Design a protein with these regions (language model features):
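S-adenosyl-L-methionine
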Residues: 2-33
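A conserved structural/catalytic subdomain of Rossmann-like adenosyl-cofactor enzymes
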Residues: 17, 32-293
Length: 293
């Protein structure tokens, strides 16, 4: 942890070692210390996590009303600890395995508490599998935001499981994958097969199951080919239009890359050689402005 802080130029970070669940170190007298922001990547599915902590927790993280995380899976113990450690205007992001989205019994009760009763969950981002060392299971990022909870009408979900590149035995998020997630999250707009705002009423009808494929359908794996383009050349306008999220961010880039085909309506001509596309993008004014943000 100290090495991580040094690498991020945080030389005076306060680091405490201990059992977060059973013996919290950050406290104000007999209650948990609260923070404006929390980022966490707790160990996945910790077993036998309940030791000195009580079922009726003295820090009010869980109880019979909220729900008590099962002893064989400590994921919600960490998430509820984070919720309790946030100020009323606080925001948190926590990486957890996908199982927290759909496992039943006590965990379903906790999801109902977080989604419907308190409305703390602002969003869920589904990540590709095999990103983390030591496990190949897919993870998700759960975003907690307390400040606007009272007026929250639903949960914004992003399905980013297909955005990655192979890097040896593991998968890795590329810069464009991260940028796409960030752009769509900031815009909070629906994108077919990728992002969607799901109402609390719809989640309730699904018994508070938050499994992303229930709400965002996967794209057809069949790649449709334009035979006319193969036979006579040109880039189908439909294919270029599908990249609208990039043209929205960099509106001038489209005209720098493409022009209308000289003889065929509905098709474009690439204005540069294929190997020069990356250079054109890198030098585009709108792209450079986005990179500086």
């Amino acid at each position: 942890a100290k090495m991580n802080m040094i690498l991020h130029n945080e030389l005076y970070a306060e680091i405490k070692q201990g059992d977060t669940i059973n013996d919290p170190q950050f406290k104000d007298e007999d209650q948990l210390k609260t923070f404006d922001y929390i980022v966490a990547n707790p160990p996945f599915s910790t077993k036998s996590w309940l030791k000195s902590a009580k079922i009726e927790d003295i820090y009010h993280r869980w109880n019979s009303t909220i729900g008590i995380p099962p002893d064989k899976n400590g994921d919600y113990a960490f998430l509820l600890h984070i919720v309790r450690s946030l100020k009323q205007t606080g925001c948190a992001a926590c990486i957890l395995p996908h199982g927290v989205l759909f496992r039943g019994n006590a965990e379903a009760q906790i999801r109902k508490f977080l989604v419907a009763e308190k409305r703390y969950i602002k969003g869920i981002i589904g990540l590709p599998s095999n990103l983390f060392f030591g496990t190949g299971i897919p993870a998700c990022i759960i975003i907690i935001e307390k400040s606007e909870a009272a007026s929250r009408k639903g949960v914004f979900m992003i399905d980013a499981k297909n955005g990655y590149t192979k890097d040896g035995p593991k998968n890795r998020l590329r810069e464009q994958d991260i940028r796409r997630i960030v752009d769509v999250w900031q815009a909070q707009r629906d994108v077919t097969h990728f992002a969607r705002f799901v109402s609390i009423e719809e989640i309730e009808k699904n018994d508070y199951n938050l499994n992303i494929p229930r709400y965002i359908s996967s794209p057809d794996t069949e790649i449709l080919q334009d035979i006319e383009a193969h036979l006579h050349g040109g880039l189908p306008q439909h294919d270029v239009d599908q990249l609208s999220m990039y043209w929205d961010v960099c509106p001038s880039l489209r005209n720098e890359l493409f022009c209308n085909h000289s003889t065929r309506n509905g098709y474009y001509t690439l204005l540069c050689e294929q190997e020069q596309v990356c250079e054109v993008v890198a030098n585009n004014t709108d792209f450079c402005q986005q990179s500086d943000i």
